[in-house]
């Protein structure tokens, strides 16, 4: 069951091991890959912060993103502005940052940019919930 409260105005946030489990993150990756591909892009930058859950989330997210043959350009562990900067000067204007930001260490989340615009968690909520 998906906690619908993880989908927020400017991002996705929740308890890393409960709300952002592997299945949910993979579904988010699939939905984001579909949105990105609809814009004519076929690549996405991906960065992580230093939270302990970041690598697990990254692995599941990449699985979902690559299910539609999207190329993931892994920036590794970087500050969030590096992902935004890469989308301005790099090979694509799409990026995802896995970050818990200022939230407690048990939390994590995703900040997403497609075609230079922030993606609201609300925008993809129904698609993620309805994905089988």
Regions found by a protein language model. Give the residues of each.
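Gly/Ser-rich phosphate-binding catalytic loop and adjacent alpha/beta segment
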Residues: 2, 9, 13-132
């Amino acid at each position: 069951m998906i906690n619908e409260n993880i989908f927020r105005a400017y991002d996705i946030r929740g308890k890393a091991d409960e709300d952002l489990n592997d299945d949910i993150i993979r579904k988010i990756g699939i939905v984001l890959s579909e949105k990105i591909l609809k814009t004519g892009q076929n690549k996405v930058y991906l960065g992580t912060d230093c939270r302990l859950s970041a690598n697990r989330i990254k692995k599941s997210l990449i699985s979902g993103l690559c299910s539609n043959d999207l190329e993931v350009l892994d920036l590794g562990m970087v500050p969030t502005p590096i992902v935004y900067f890469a989308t301005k000067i790099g090979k694509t204007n799409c990026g995802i940052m896995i970050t818990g930001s200022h939230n407690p260490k048990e939390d994590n989340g995703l900040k997403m940019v497609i075609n230079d615009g922030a993606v609201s968690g609300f925008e993809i909520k129904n698609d993620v919930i309805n994905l089988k």
